[in-house]
């Protein structure tokens, strides 16, 4: 009887121990599978070297106060100072309690609020990818470099690096972004009363292997931050859809709501598996 009880107890302990081993092994395998799948998705869209062996740079646009320009430069570009402008207190800040302060402001460059929002979306998204770190850099600094993966925020009229990328021969789609997006197929997209427009374009970096160039820009400030939100939240899906291929996605963004960004036009060669899934989905409708 004692031997039987001992055998039952031993079998119970062995079963519990083996179950724990299987549970832990399954958990670790699942985590490893998630990690490798996420890493592969990240590398397909941002490049195999991005954020590890080379920089992953979020390039911020900057603008300057025209009142600081010398008179000859203002005259050249057709800008006149407003009457009675005060160069010592150029900006104001309104507080919730109603009081207002005046400040000189920066003497060199200003960062648009939409670019700050966009950078925050991207940095938060990349924090979830193990081993990946992103840095922000001003467009003036980034314009001197090509070694790295660059994500630019702002149009070619406010971000020097966006202008550099727009003028690459590898850009097969975007002609210009001055007031409207004009494309090489002859189409154009403009801002509507309630909707800004955004654009996410990815090119493979022609100057270095394993790195990419991505533009997040907008017609209207919500177009810029909305496009950055779209990339930050949808990069895994974009990776499945396009693989390593270049692409351009045009977006419509409700003013005041970055998370409303939705696709209205797309260019690029989709992965064959994505096309097959889309075909079967349409066939079943």
Enumerate the language-model features and the residues they cover:
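Hydrophobic, helix-forming membrane-interacting segments
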Residues: 1-38
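Solvent-exposed alpha-helical segments and adjacent loops
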Residues: 32-285
């Amino acid at each position: 009887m004692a031997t039987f009880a001992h055998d039952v107890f031993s079998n119970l302990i062995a079963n519990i121990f083996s179950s724990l081993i299987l549970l832990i092994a399954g958990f670790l395998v699942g985590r490893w599978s998630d990690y490798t799948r996420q890493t592969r998705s990240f590398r397909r869209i941002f490049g195999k070297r991005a954020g590890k062996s080379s920089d992953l740079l979020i390039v911020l646009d900057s603008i300057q106060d025209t009142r600081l320009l010398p008179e000859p430069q203002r005259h050249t570009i057709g800008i006149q100072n407003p009457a009675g402008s005060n160069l010592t207190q150029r900006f104001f800040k309104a507080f919730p309690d109603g009081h207002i302060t005046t400040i000189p402001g920066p003497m060199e460059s200003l960062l648009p609020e939409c670019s700050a929002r966009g950078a925050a979306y991207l940095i938060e998204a990349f924090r979830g990818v193990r081993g990946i770190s992103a840095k922000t850099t001003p467009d003036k600094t980034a314009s001197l470099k090509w070694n790295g993966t660059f994500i630019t925020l702002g149009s070619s009229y406010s971000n020097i690096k966006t202008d550099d990328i727009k003028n690459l021969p590898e850009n097969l789609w975007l002609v210009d972004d001055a007031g409207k997006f004009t494309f090489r197929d002859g189409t154009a997209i403009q801002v509507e009363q309630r909707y800004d427009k955004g654009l996410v374009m990815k090119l493979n970096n022609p100057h270095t292997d394993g790195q990419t160039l991505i533009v997040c820009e907008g017609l209207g400030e919500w177009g810029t931050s909305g496009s950055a939100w779209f990339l930050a939240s949808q990069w895994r899906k974009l990776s499945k859809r396009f693989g390593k291929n270049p692409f351009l996605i045009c977006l419509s963004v409700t003013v005041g709501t970055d998370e409303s960004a939705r696709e209205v036009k797309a260019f690029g060669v989709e992965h064959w598996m994505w096309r097959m899934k889309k075909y079967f989905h349409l066939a079943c409708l």
